[in-house]
Amino acid sequence: MKKKSSLSEEDQALFRQLMAGTRQIKQDTIVHRPPRKKISEVPVKRLIQEQADASHYFSDEFQPLLNTEGPVKYVRPDVSHFEAKKLRRGDYSPELFLDLHGLTQLQAKQELGALIATCRREHVFCACVMHGHGKHILKQQTPLWLAQHPHVMAFHQAPKEYGGDAALLVLIEVEEWLPPELP
């Protein structure tokens, strides 16, 4: 189907007359290159390996000594207890969130391992793990697993805005870790 021109025959003739003697410009200045692939993509094999490596830290048989009274909290022996206080007050805001709702214990361990590996790779030092209330299986196991991991510096029950007693704020040790300056 031929497109109708909105110009009158007179205007078309005038346009042709004015354009007589001109030639079409050859496009020779801009070269369109195909888009480059992102180099920062992490290979799938590496992600699977990180997940498997990180999940081997979590044992169901090992029971670390955690305080059962009050809010759930843990501070590694070489870390200041003030870090747990900062987590409780909400001085650290999590950059990554992990929701464990509906996962089995095995899946939850793998996801926790992947979260810690991702935090270390992306230099994220605070994450929120939402275990929920449910049947209290993940709520009881999550702190025990986190306390076993060598890169977990501290964790504390999350403030209300991040899930309250159904979540934990976790402080992860990354290379060259420096606490942020408080205003």
Curated annotation (Swiss-Prot):
PROSITE patterns: SMR. Keywords: Endonuclease, Hydrolase, Nuclease, RNA-binding, rRNA-binding. Pfam families: Smr. Its EC number is 3.1.-.-. Disulfide bonds: none annotated. InterPro entries: Smr_dom (IPR002625), Smr_dom_sf (IPR036063), SmrB-like (IPR022990). GO terms for biological process: rescue of stalled ribosome. The keyword Hydrolase applies. The keyword RNA-binding applies. Residues 98-173 form the Smr domain. One of its GO terms (molecular function) is RNA endonuclease activity. Belongs to the SmrB family. Associates with collided ribosomes, but not with correctly translating polysomes. Acts as a ribosome collision sensor. Detects stalled/collided disomes (pairs of ribosomes where the leading ribosome is stalled and a second ribosome has collided with it) and endonucleolytically cleaves mRNA at the 5' boundary of the stalled ribosome. Stalled/collided disomes form a new interface (primarily via the 30S subunits) that binds SmrB. Cleaved mRNA becomes available for tmRNA ligation, leading to ribosomal subunit dissociation and rescue of stalled ribosomes. NCBIfam families: PRK04946.1. This is Ribosome rescue factor SmrB. It comes from Escherichia fergusonii (strain ATCC 35469 / DSM 13698 / CCUG 18766 / IAM 14443 / JCM 21226 / LMG 7866 / NBRC 102419 / NCTC 12128 / CDC 0568-73). The gene is smrB.
